């Protein structure tokens, strides 16, 4: 044990010198040696194996090391650590609902929707018009925001490598490029869901304040209750559980071989159902003829 302790101390000294020389590759190679000594002493095998796999993955790809797996500074890494988790949160879901989920209810309040009862805007077209226009606008804002963030961070810190391991717990070796693309595509799916659900609520409630109130109760209520024990068996049936693709891959209550496929089909099916119900409900409403 004394010999191992001395070896570890010497390795820490070498690591300190490597950091002073800003040689992160050498620092991490030494970390593998330290980890191997720790394994001999019965320390956390799972954590150490994951850390060693991460280090070897970066070295084998010939990449420059980030400061740490989940404290990356370059664009393609930091975006899935900071920006995407912020976008995939209840606060932003409510912002999406406010910007794109209440347009139909606002038209009811302004009585403007009555003027759409023309051959061009029939029962079906008015619902699809609101859906398509809001999804397009929000998607455009989404892409612009991501582009500015990537370019802005890239300008100051560099863009990094898309094949750098993300370091996400449970899936640490999945590359940043894959995580970023998955988040990007899923964002469009979430936008379509929220807009379609907002239209559904609007044709029944007809008041934008009520629509936002329902959204707030659902999203914030989900955040407050999702970690409660009694919710464990229910989470896999709630659409909000499938809003974040990384949660699908890493959370115990969702992770499965086909989790992402199930999520896509489930949310897509709900979008279609919401639109069909909205169109049917709209046809039962009374309008002033032009």
Roles of regions detected by a PLM:
Residues 1, 65-79, 161-178, 209-212, ...:
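Terminal transmembrane helical anchor/hairpin motif
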Residues 1-86, 203, 266-267, 271-290:
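Hydrophobic alpha-helical transmembrane segments
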Residues 43-64, 106-107, 143, 147-149, ...:
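Alpha-helical transmembrane segments of integral membrane proteins, especially early/N-terminal helices
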Residues 60-105, 128-199, 203, 246-264:
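Secretory targeting signals
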Residues 100-115, 119:
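Transmembrane helix boundary and interhelical loop/hinge segments in multi-pass membrane proteins
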Residues 107, 188, 192, 220, ...:
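Hydrophobic alpha-helical transmembrane bundles that constitute the permease/transmembrane domains
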Residues 111-112, 196, 212:
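Transmembrane alpha-helix boundary/hinge residues in polytopic small-molecule transporters
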Residues 122, 206-208:
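Short loop-to-helix capping motifs
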């Amino acid at each position: 044990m004394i010999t191992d302790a001395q070896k570890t101390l010497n390795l820490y000294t070498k690591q300190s010198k490597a950091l002073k020389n800003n040689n992160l590759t050498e620092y991490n190679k030494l970390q593998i040696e330290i980890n191997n000594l720790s394994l001999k002493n019965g320390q956390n095998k799972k954590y150490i194996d994951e850390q060693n796999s991460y280090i070897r993955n970066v070295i084998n790809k010939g990449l420059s090391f980030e400061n740490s797996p989940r404290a990356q500074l370059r664009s393609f890494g930091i975006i899935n650590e900071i920006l995407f988790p912020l976008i995939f949160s209840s606060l932003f879901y409510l912002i999406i609902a406010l910007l794109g989920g209440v347009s139909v209810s606002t038209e009811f309040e302004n009585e403007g929707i009555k003027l759409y009862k023309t051959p061009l805007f029939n029962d079906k077209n008015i619902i699809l018009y609101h859906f398509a226009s809001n999804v397009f606008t929000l998607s455009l804002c989404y892409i612009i925001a991501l582009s500015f963030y990537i370019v802005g961070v890239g300008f100051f810190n560099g863009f990094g490598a898309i094949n750098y391991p993300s370091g996400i717990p449970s899936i640490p070796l999945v590359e940043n490029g894959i995580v970023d693309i998955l988040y990007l595509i899923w964002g469009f799916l979430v936008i379509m869901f929220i807009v379609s659900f907002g239209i559904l609520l609007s044709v029944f409630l007809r008041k934008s304040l009520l629509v936002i109130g329902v959204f707030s109760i659902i999203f914030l209520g989900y955040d407050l209750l999702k970690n409660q024990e009694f919710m464990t068996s229910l989470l896999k049936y709630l659409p909000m559980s499938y809003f974040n693709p990384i949660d699908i891959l890493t959370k115990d209550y969702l992770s499965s071989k086909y989790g992402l496929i199930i999520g896509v089909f489930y949310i897509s099916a709900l979008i279609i159902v919401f639109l069909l119900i909205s169109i049917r409900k709209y046809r039962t409403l009374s309008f002033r003829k032009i």
